[in-house]
Amino acid sequence: MRIAIVLNTSWNIFNFRMNFVRHLLTLGYEVHTIAPYDDYTHLLEEAGCIHHNVRMDSRGANPLKDSALIAELFMIYRKVKPGIILHYTIKPNVYGTIAASLLRIPVVNNVCGLGTVFLKNDAISFVAMMLYKISFRFAKKVFFQNPDDLNLFLEKKLVSPAAVDLIPGSGIDLKRFTPTSFSRNEKFTFLLISRLITDKGILEYIEAVQKLKSEGIDARFQLLGAMDPRHKRGIKTEVIQSWINSGTVEYLGTTQDVRHFIQQADCIVLPSYREGTPRTLLEAASSSKPIIATNVPGCNHVVEDNYNGMLCRLKDADDLAEKMKQMQRLTDVQLLELGQNGRLKMEKEYDESIVINKYLQTLHDLTPAS
């Protein structure tokens, strides 16, 4: 059977869906990946996928470009003739579903997170909801990554209750992200891993760090992730450089493997505004690291306050700084317990096999009996 997997970047497929893709290939599925070409496309092809390039601007909303995207996806779908199409991220979910409906190809969508668009009551939010409502009536199944997003879509009647299901994000590979022996750093180390955009709480993190330093708190404050100044909520390069030059944070750049950086930190921080299920927190918890995250949808399902980490208030740098102080004051035994609890939570609730099995069951249910 031919399966199409559609995302906004090849990088996303390789980093978050590759074990699922390999599983499909092992089972004999013909897997077609559809995403813009990038540095990871050849890795998909080397794994056995048949790749199709698509022009997709994931950054903005341009009606003309988005209309062209529907047409382009329609042409690809008509050529490939997949039995089922799996969409991830906003534009494939919306425009890909519309294109597939014209060809009557069954679609499975994955709402990876709503970002901040649904937090506002403006024209953009209204248009986004209308697009979801129009497109999602054609989806056979819609997976959500946290119950808050699922309930929001049901309350606003954007999706049929019969079509929805819940999965723990993309899951986590428990064999890849494993704990190391506990060893507290001589200088307590906080690490935030994220693209450098405001929605991830970067500005609150920096403000909290500045507050802690002004109080004489002796710790290391690190930042790992790509600069993205072209993003509409990206932080300007010169601003980031000023943080580096002033010694506010240690900027670690980017990496293709975060495991070493997670392992050398004492605590992982993510004061994000809203998430689906943040991969960074799954990786941290699976590695038995204590976490500080915002008490918002997505984050507060991965982090249980005072069980495997601490929750701080949204957009509140003072509260974040207070939680960071509390974390640093914990004894080795308390830090170890938080980390171990996080690992147990991942094993029980977030093993990627849970996600893979739900998708396989859905594919089975949607496959016509021969």
Predicted regions and their residues:
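Aromatic "clamp/platform" in nucleotide-sugar-dependent glycosyltransferases that forms part
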Residues: 254, 273
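A conserved mid-protein helix/loop that constitutes part of the nucleotide-sugar donor-binding site
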Residues: 15-19, 188, 192, 197-211, ...
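A short, well-ordered alpha-helix in the C-terminal region of glycosyltransferases
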Residues: 319, 326, 333-349, 355-361
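Short His-centered aromatic/hydrophobic patch
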Residues: 87-93, 111
